Amino acid sequence: MPLNPAARAQPAPRRPLIVRLRNWVGDVTLAVPTLRRLDDAGYALQLIGKGWARELLAGHGWPVHPLPKTMGERIALLRRLKAEAQAVDAQFNRRLNTLCLPDSFSSALEFRLAGLRALGHAHEGRSLLLARALPLPRTVHALQVYWQMADVLLGATAPLPAAIGLLVSDAHRAQAQALCARHGIVPGSLYICPFAGGTWAQQDKTWPDFPAFAAQVLPRHGRRVVVCPGPGEEAVAQEHFGSATVLNDVDLGTYAALLQEAALMVANDTGPGHMAAAVGTPLVSVLGPSDPALWRAWGPAVQLVQGAAGWPTADSVSLAVQRALTTD
């Protein structure tokens, strides 16, 4: 007797996988290809990360749970997600069921105390806490580090992707269009991100010539210059980049939608630069002390501009901008 066509067409059940994201926008952006690969392989992702991660990843439709502040609250969340996964997957406790992208001791400890079987890197004495501990690569780009974790989880290798492919939700695209309409911003504008969180080898990652470049060089291209400061960056944007259109309080999903319509972004080593590359927008990445081999923005339209012994000149950045706009 032939099988019922409806029964034959039923897809295989998706396997729950809990994923702890890292804490920086650039790191989460570089993990997107790995998350997409796991999603395509049949995993039902349950992501845990900073509050902004939900907006950043909204276009992919993955559940993103805000990372609680205390260890007790984080363990309680993990136990709840574990119980929900067990209810739909009888094999959940018999396999690697958690991906730990951070390398901190506390993240591995929380998974262990929640009774989860985590895959992560051997670092800071975490090996005994993880169900499987991998050597931590020291000279490999972050995107490749995450990609290799998926190799282990899936039991198969795959070529590295040429592009990240960050998706933008329809809601964020509509918000971006409304914002542009209010401020008279048209497609093909130039976006800058002159901010940079943290340091590299105790050195500032902010290009010192950025204010003069934004005020004197970029306007020569006849396009609107736009800056979207993050929390705590508003005063710096107004004081040093007041000649640009300043958009405050823009969430990361809307920011990504704005960048999709940009002609170009010029950025320091910072999260929005990674976002621009991730949505396919040409990026001029201005680097000083950062090591591009480990953390550069990833994509076919990325130009790295770095001095031989420090920051690049304004002329070299200007040439990169001209190349990008000519190609566009």
Which residues does each PLM region occupy?
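Catalytic machinery of carbohydrate-active enzymes
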Residues: 1-328
